[in-house]
Amino acid sequence: MVGAAILESPGEGIGSNSILSQKRQLSSSDAAKRDAKKRSTMLMDLEILDCPICYEAFTIPIFQCDNGHLACSSCCPKLNNKCPACTSPVGHNRCRAMESVLESILIPCPNAKLGCKKNVSYGKELTHEKECMFSHCACPALDCNYTSSYKDLYTHYRITHMEINQINTFICDIPLSVRMNISKKILIRTEHLTNHLFAVQCFREPYGVYVTVSCIAPSSPELSQYSYALSYTVDGHTVIYQSPEVKRVLKLSFQTPQENFMLIPNSLLRGDVLEMRISVKKLNKE
């Protein structure tokens, strides 16, 4: 909360020297007070920073109609740029005042209790959470609800889900042959040096099978980044897919991917088993 200092006039019993003294004190501490105000600013109701139409957190740009009604950039095209409150045009005039307020609001990272000390702009918590080193990752094994830091996830997976004497590791830049059952949907492998968990997923659709590769880890620039290549050969036909990036996720999605996948058409499928070669390349050092 921001406080205000009130100076009394000489007629109220305070001499001019006292006033000058107070002014000097205020002047000398102005910068410190401004910093303190920034640190201690508190909103009683953060809902005023949400779009009144979709109730999602505002992000820049924010638009307003001629009557001052606000709308987020996602809602404007959905409303055909017509304000639902007064039917005035909306989506052309920015609300700079609200954008300035939004830029000034910082809130603790959702992982503050786990150790993250960063403050993030309001509305960007989810973006930060995806790359926060303190974010918990979900175990990729089917029907397992375990979550932990990415560092501890490998230990859990090895102890709980890995079969004895099963070879589940691979080395970057060395092609790996994998054999997976389409109906099982997922195959887990671990990178030899970092112990990062990689998931090979397949999704059967009416026109073929989608295959994609993900890494279970935050998308932090501090962690290793990878690219990958997939190849599938049958009866002299080869399907090849190369991706410049292995997508890093906190939790696997079991929805058919819309990008970064290899599609094997039905005409090249032979039963329920896929035999593929996968090559993962490290792009930076952790």
UniProtKB/Swiss-Prot annotation:
Functional pathway: Protein modification; protein ubiquitination
InterPro entries reported for this sequence: Sina-like_RING, SINL_plant, Znf_RING, Znf_RING/FYVE/PHD, Znf_SIAH
SUPFAM superfamilies in the record: RING/U-box, TRAF domain-like
Highest taxon in the source lineage: Eukaryota
The enzyme's E.C. designation: 2.3.2.27
Record-listed Zn(2+) 2 binding positions: C139, C144, H156, H161
First-tier enzyme category under EC: transferase
GO molecular function: ubiquitin protein ligase activity; zinc ion binding
Family: Belongs to the SINA (Seven in absentia) family.
UniProt comment concerning the protein's domains: The RING-type zinc finger domain is essential for ubiquitin ligase activity. The SBD domain (substrate-binding domain) mediates the homodimerization and the interaction with substrate proteins. It is related to the TRAF family.
Cited function: E3 ubiquitin-protein ligase that mediates ubiquitination and subsequent proteasomal degradation of target proteins. E3 ubiquitin ligases accept ubiquitin from an E2 ubiquitin-conjugating enzyme in the form of a thioester and then directly transfers the ubiquitin to targeted substrates. It probably triggers the ubiquitin-mediated degradation of different substrates.
Name of the molecule in the record: E3 ubiquitin-protein ligase SINA-like 7
Gene source species: Arabidopsis thaliana
